[in-house]
Structure formats: structure tokens, C-alpha cells
């Protein structure tokens, strides 16, 4: 009996010493024993349920009925409130006998004030479910309304990311939330992230918690057919950068600190083997279909593919995270002066989120290419680069040049100068980036304030 036990113990020890060949434990993702760690040793995937199909929006009333819902808050913005996506949702609710109230005052690029207005509406309504119909602004606003109406005694900054907020863990149960995205970019229907402008500091921040992710995302590609050209382009740039940044992010087991409790493990954990798969797949779709989707509104194959790619990238970055392009984008959007983007019906100056992200991408990936050059080269090749004579030391420059050509072909504004910024704005842009440590710390290459300033300077002109 003892001999048998000794044999089992010997076998277990041999297995522990064996070299594991799976992606999670080879090269980038190799792990040390989990004793006294300063960096994390685990990652987890938190994703909303997703249902995809043309005209699948018609099922939303049945879902709410199946859940026993009695009083629903439907959130959208004024531009969408009279259009077919919202009409399809409301028709389904009426058909299935669901009581609802419509909130159509969501602000495109929401602020803390617009969040609080929506939260107050939700608190007064005593809703038992939420529906968000729109782009990332609508879905993020609805997430916040669900959270704070479910935790009515919380201060607004309790759940906001540090250093602006307290970053408390969400421990209260939330109501079901169905997201119906009408753009192909943010991936917000799959993530536990809600982004807004904190007006006092003129900086973007947000709430990041798996608890606020939608219960269900209804991915209905029919809603993409009426998207204007620049909305398609700018939302597609968000998919592009979600994919690139999550794939090149600091690996999850190099991120610190190691949480003492799994509830404290951040939503943005660093690149990992599962997120990598979704990021690369989304990037391939962008490479194949984004230009077609922008140039031809009747190209159903391209527009439908990009709508799904947004969710694919959301699965990836919603767990791996993003880094410098997004971190630097927040002050670009927050400090906007007079720029008004084409095809956006808003009453205020606006640098659309996807545009604010992609304008720094050539400079950023030139900078990060030294740290994971193989991944930068792989991304460049997916986007069309010829690597036959490529040198690994040039990985960042190759990806940057590939991105410049891609953006030029899609008539993207020629850098930050084209959207109203000058060299004198760089200190404010750097200052606005510093609070974004939640994402910037996932850059594969550490950076100083001087290096951030150099990246903004390099992004003033693209071509």
C-alpha cells in the first residue's frame, strides 16, 4: 500500500517538473509558484451572453417576459429615439406586454453630469430591468444607471476608477441589462466598462467591474446599414485599436499587484491566451472588411462582419485591457476645442472616441515595438505589410507605417493638429493622460511624462 502511494507521489512530482507546452505556460506566459507573488498568476474571462442575427432585436420583449420583468428602463439618445433600432425594441416590448419608460437624453461622449442625470431617472423609476439601444455612450450610461440605482446610497465617486474615484468593488446585485449596439466599435455590449468625461479635470475616467457587464448583448447587424460613413470609420478604428492594444498589452502574469482576493482582480488584466485569440480574429476582420464597410453602405457582408468584430474585440480587450492609445485618447477627447466631426449630429464640439484613439496609434506602436516585436510584426502582416525583408528591430516602425497607410486610405484627419491641437497643448494632454493608469500601466513598455509628451508631439501630424 505504501509502495503504491509512494509511486503516485513520485509520478505527481515528475508531472510537476514536466515542461508544459500549452500557450498559457510557454514563453510569455510562463509562471512561477503562487507563493509570495508580487505579480498576478491567474486571469479570468468575464463576457456577456451574446446573441447574433439579423433582426434578432425582435426577440427582446420575449427575453424580458421570460425573466418576469414588469418595469423596464429603455435608454437611448435623441438622434436614435425616432429611428428603426429603437422602434424595433419598443415594438417588441409592446407586443409582449412589457411596461417601460424611455430615457432618450443620453449624451454622446457622456460626462459625470449626464451619468448622474440618467442615474436619477433610474432611481425614481424603480425599474427591474434595463435596455440600452445605441452606441457605447448609451450602453455605458445605462450600466452606470443600473449600478447606482441598485446601490442608491453610494457616492458617485465610490465606484469610479482611481485616482479620480475610490474604485470600490461592486458587491450589490444589479438588475438584468440587455444591450442592443447600433455602432460597430466600442464592444460595450460585452464588457464591464463604463467611460465618461469627468468635467472638473477635463479628463476621461470610468467604472470598471465585471458586475456591470450586460446580461445579454443582442447583436443585430441590420442596425448598421444606416450608419453614416465617418461613424463607420471611427467606430471601426476603435475595433482596430482594441485588437492591437489588447494583443500587445503587458502579459497578465507581469501585471502587479497580485490581488489578495479575486474580487479585486481588475477587469483589465493584461494579454492572455484567450483574449489573444479574439484580438487577432477581430484584427483580421478589420483588415478585410473595414474599408469596404466605410466606402459602400450597401455592402452588407462588410457591415455585418464589422458589427460582429466589435464584439469579438470586446471579448478580448474587455479582459486583457488596452494601453497607451486609449489612455492618451481621453484627454484628446476631453480637451476638444472647436472640432466637429462630420456625420455626428451633436450640439457640442466632438472628437469621436475611435478617432481620438487611432490618431496616436502610429507613434504608440513605434514606441512599444521593442518590447514584443513578434506581436507587432504579426499585427502588421495581418494589416497587409510585406515582411519578407523585415528586421525584428524595426517591428514598431513597420506596424506604424502600415497603420499610416491604412488611415490615409480611409481619409483620416492628418494628426492632432487637424483636430485643433498645437504643441502648446501637449502639457495639458500629458496631464490628462496621467490619471489613466488603469490602462497605461498595461503598456508593454514603461513610459515617463517626457516620453508621453514626445508621443503627442509625434502624433501632431500623421502623413
From Swiss-Prot:
Name of the protein: Hydroxyacid-oxoacid transhydrogenase, mitochondrial
EC number from the UniProt entry: 1.1.99.24
Gene name, Swiss-Prot/TrEMBL: adhfe1
Enzymatic reactions: (S)-3-hydroxybutanoate + 2-oxoglutarate = (R)-2-hydroxyglutarate + acetoacetate; 4-hydroxybutanoate + 2-oxoglutarate = (R)-2-hydroxyglutarate + succinate semialdehyde
Organism domain of life: Eukaryota
Protein keywords: Lipid metabolism, Mitochondrion, Oxidoreductase, Transit peptide
Molecular function terms from GO: alcohol dehydrogenase (NAD+) activity; hydroxyacid-oxoacid transhydrogenase activity; metal ion binding
Family as reported in the entry's similarity comment: Belongs to the iron-containing alcohol dehydrogenase family. Hydroxyacid-oxoacid transhydrogenase subfamily.
GO terms under cellular component: mitochondrion
Phylogenetic classification of the source organism: Eukaryota, Metazoa, Chordata, Craniata, Vertebrata
Amino acid at each position: 500500500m505504501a509502495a503504491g502511494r509512494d509511486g503516485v507521489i513520485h509520478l505527481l512530482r515528475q508531472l510537476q517538473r514536466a515542461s508544459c507546452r500549452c500557450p498559457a505556460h510557454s514563453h510569455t506566459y510562463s509562471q512561477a509558484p503562487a507563493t509570495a507573488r508580487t505579480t498576478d498568476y491567474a486571469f479570468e474571462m468575464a463576457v456577456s451572453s451574446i446573441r447574433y442575427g439579423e433582426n434578432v432585436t425582435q426577440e427582446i420583449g420575449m427575453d424580458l417576459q421570460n425573466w418576469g420583468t414588469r418595469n423596464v428602463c429603455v435608454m437611448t439618445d435623441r438622434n436614435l429615439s425616432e429611428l428603426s433600432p429603437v422602434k424595433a425594441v419598443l415594438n417588441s416590448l409592446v407586443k409582449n406586454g412589457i411596461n417601460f419608460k424611455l430615457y432618450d437624453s443620453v449624451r454622446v461622449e457622456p460626462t459625470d453630469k449626464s451619468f448622474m442625470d440618467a442615474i436619477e431617472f433610474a432611481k425614481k423609476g424603480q425599474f427591474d430591468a434595463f435596455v440600452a439601444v445605441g452606441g457605447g455612450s448609451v450602453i455605458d450610461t445605462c450600466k452606470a444607471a443600473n449600478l447606482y440605482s441598485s446601490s442608491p446610497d453610494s457616492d458617485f465617486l465610490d465606484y469610479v476608477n482611481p485616482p479620480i474615484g475610490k474604485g470600490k468593488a461592486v458587491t450589490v446585485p444589479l438588475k438584468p441589462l440587455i444591450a442592443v449596439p447600433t455602432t460597430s466599435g466600442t464592444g460595450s455590449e460585452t464588457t464591464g466598462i463604463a467611460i465618461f468625461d469627468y468635467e472638473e479635470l477635463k479628463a476621461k475616467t470610468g467604472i470598471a467591474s465585471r458586475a456591470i457587464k450586460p446580461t445579454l448583448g443582442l447583436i443585430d447587424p441590420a442596425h448598421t446599414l444606416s450608419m453614416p460613413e465617418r461613424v463607420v470609420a471611427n467606430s471601426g478604428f476603435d475595433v482596430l485599436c482594441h485588437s492591437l492594444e489588447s494583443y500587445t498589452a503587458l502579459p497578465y502574469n507581469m501585471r502587479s499587484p497580485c490581488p489578495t482576493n479575486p474580487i479585486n482582480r481588475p477587469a483589465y488584466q493584461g494579454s492572455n491566451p484567450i483574449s489573444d485569440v479574439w484580438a487577432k480574429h477581430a484584427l483580421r476582420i478589420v483588415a478585410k472588411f473595414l474599408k469596404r464597410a466605410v466606402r459602400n453602405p450597401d455592402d452588407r457582408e462588410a457591415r455585418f462582419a464589422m458589427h460582429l468584430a466589435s464584439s469579438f474585440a470586446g471579448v478580448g480587450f474587455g479582459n486583457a485591457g488596452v494601453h497607451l492609445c486609449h489612455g492618451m485618447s481621453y484627454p484628446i477627447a476631453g480637451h476638444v476645442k472647436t472640432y466637429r466631426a462630420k456625420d455626428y449630429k451633436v450640439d457640442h464640439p466632438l472628437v469621436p472616441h475611435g478617432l481620438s484613439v487611432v490618431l496616436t496609434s502610429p507613434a504608440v506602436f513605434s514606441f512599444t515595438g521593442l518590447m514584443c516585436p513578434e506581436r507587432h510584426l504579426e499585427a502588421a502582416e495581418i494589416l497587409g505589410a510585406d515582411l519578407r525583408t523585415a528586421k525584428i528591430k524595426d517591428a514598431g516602425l513597420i506596424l506604424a507605417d502600415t497603420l499610416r497607410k491604412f488611415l490615409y486610405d480611409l481619409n483620416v484627419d492628418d494628426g492632432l493638429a487637424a483636430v485643433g491641437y498645437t504643441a502648446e497643448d501637449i502639457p495639458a494632454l500629458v496631464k490628462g493622460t496621467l490619471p489613466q493608469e488603469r490602462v497605461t500601466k498595461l503598456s508593454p513598455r514603461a513610459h515617463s511624462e517626457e516620453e508621453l509628451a514626445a508621443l503627442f508631439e509625434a502624433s501632431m501630424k500623421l502623413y
